[in-house]
Amino acid sequence: MGRLHSKGKGISSSALPYRRTAPSWLKISSQDVDETICKFAKKGLTPSQIGVILRDSHGIAQVKSVTGSKILRILKAHGLAPEIPEDLYHLIKKAVSIRKHLERFRKDKDSKFRLILVESRIHRLARYYKKTKKLPPVWKYESTTASTLVA
């Protein structure tokens, strides 16, 4: 499947391990992993940042193989999940930074065009998240209030 607003095909991906069980050399329990995830979430890290830290410094390649549930589900169980999904949050952040750039450089036509593309992606994702009930049905992206969502 190709990218939405570019020519890229997106064929690169990491290979998942064949076995879906925790490795035998991993001596950490699922409760310890839960506590670690909650500790990082309280520091303000996103679920993907938590996964990178667990992979790089704790040796946990897949949280689901150790605990039986994914990082976001663990965060939801403890009430620490972000109110806006992470990919939508980063798109809003990108749109805010492009708008800030356009305030300084009003004639930057390419940035205006890219802002239109980013905002159309935001609307498309928001429609999907409303349909799957991850966002409230009255949630709406507005460029004027977007900086408060990101800050």
UniProtKB/Swiss-Prot annotation:
GO terms for molecular function: small ribosomal subunit rRNA binding; structural constituent of ribosome. InterPro entries: Ribosomal_uS15, Ribosomal_uS15_arc_euk, Ribosomal_uS15_N, uS15_NS1_RNA-bd_sf. One of its GO terms (biological process) is translation. One of its GO terms (cellular component) is cytosolic small ribosomal subunit. Keywords: Ribonucleoprotein, Ribosomal protein. Belongs to the universal ribosomal protein uS15 family. This is Small ribosomal subunit protein uS15. It comes from Pisum sativum (Garden pea).
